[in-house]
Amino acid sequence: MEKLLDEIYDSVPQGGAQSDGAESANFNLYSFDDTGNAQRFFNLFGGEMIYNHIDKMWLYWDGKRWHADLDKETYRRAAISVEEMRKELEFYQNQDDSDGTENAKNFSKHIKYTRSMKGEKALIEMAQQLLPVLPSQLDRHIMAFNTASGIISLKTGELTPHNPKWFITKISEVEYSAGNNYSCPRWLKFLDEIFNGDKDLIHYVQKAVGYSLTGKTSEQCAFFLFGTGNNGKSTFLDVVRDIAGEYAMNIQPETIMIRTATAAANSDIARLKGARLVTSVEPNEGVRINEGLLKQLTGEDTVTARKLYGNEFEFKPEFKLWMATNHKPIIRGTDTGIWRRIHMIPFTVSIPEEKKDKQLKDKLEREYPDILRWAVEGCLLWQREGLEMPRAVREMCKEYRREMDVISAFIDDRCEVAEKSFAKASQLYAAYVTWCDENNEHKFSNTKFGVEMAKRFEKKRTMDGWFYVGIKLLQ
């Protein structure tokens, strides 16, 4: 991997500040125009500035990561480049011949032009051509996690110094020190409280959080945190999001629900490129998950997205979705393809108001460095053990799937399953439609209903039409 990173870094043009002794030898290489200005800028900042032509954005190395220039750092450095041109002017002024005098006169005029808005803008635009970088060259190492202390290898837990060659653009501001030991007693007590002492569940959650620090999506799952209020799930999610830092993003729950504004949804998805942990909180009751989109986002396939007013682009999702909810989002699909992706984590403990720790958030923040070590240890455990659901999660998922199975609910309520019974398909569907209307349930089409019933019962054709064998309508 290090060799690959060296090759990528070497492919990006590098400049660098000149030494005092080399200045006079290089001054004659610069032209008195925009191209020369760009070359001056390049030689000063070529190792610290890059330009992403696809996203049309400058990035600068701040000592820890490549930072998107949202605060006009490029213009500040352009101003420094112009100030450095005074040394070049002095070089020409110190020449005794007529060429030196003429050059000094012309260069003085050129400096005045370069200081103008037009000249400064031209300098920056020309420099873009000298310092190109592709989006594919950024954040390539999905098992590296950048922190205030250095880069964590999520394969080993070891820490290495910050390095521009890694082309990392994100960071968690949490400090980290390598080692197997961590001390976060209030965090561990909090987990014990909200998960009711279920050690298997806590062990699973530690691995899930650690897995979510990586850019891998091999588990192909989303985490739903379910429970009524006052159970700690929001606090839990806040802590996980905080230690993930810039690797975490939040989305409105509507992004992954069925809705008509597909353009807005696609723009929301475009924001998630490069994120590793995506959180969402409290979808409205009765909303339905966009199952096709959820499958796509939790898989390992390429996604097509488009920023608002921008062009389409493709990327592979690296994020894991964590959604906290008091209401179970509606899932109409009955296939394993959707249900195997849902990991519903139960939050069954309700914490009374009088027992709430008002200082809990502050106490947990003081433990962030060790909570990060706890999460990295979870990542190492995940790589050794996998992410098999514990009993509490399996049972919650099973209950969730049963609740979402409208046809099974209809059969339980209006039918009798018996080996030698039979029911006419048209009558069964009519009864199903009536039952859905009475219970305010979503109705499948006749075709979809037939497909689902055929999974459960044998279907035969007679002179009187189609019948299902092994079921009858209750009178």
Identify the role of each PLM range:
Residues K72-E90:
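Acidic, aromatic-enriched beta-alpha/helix-loop junctions
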Residues M57-Y60, R65-A78:
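Trp- and S/T/G-rich repeat-edge/linker motifs of beta-rich repeat architectures
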Residues M1-Q14:
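N-terminal acidic, proline/glycine-rich, low-complexity intrinsically disordered segments
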Residues Q14-M57, M85-Q475:
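Feature primarily recognizes SF3-like P-loop helicase cores of small DNA viruses
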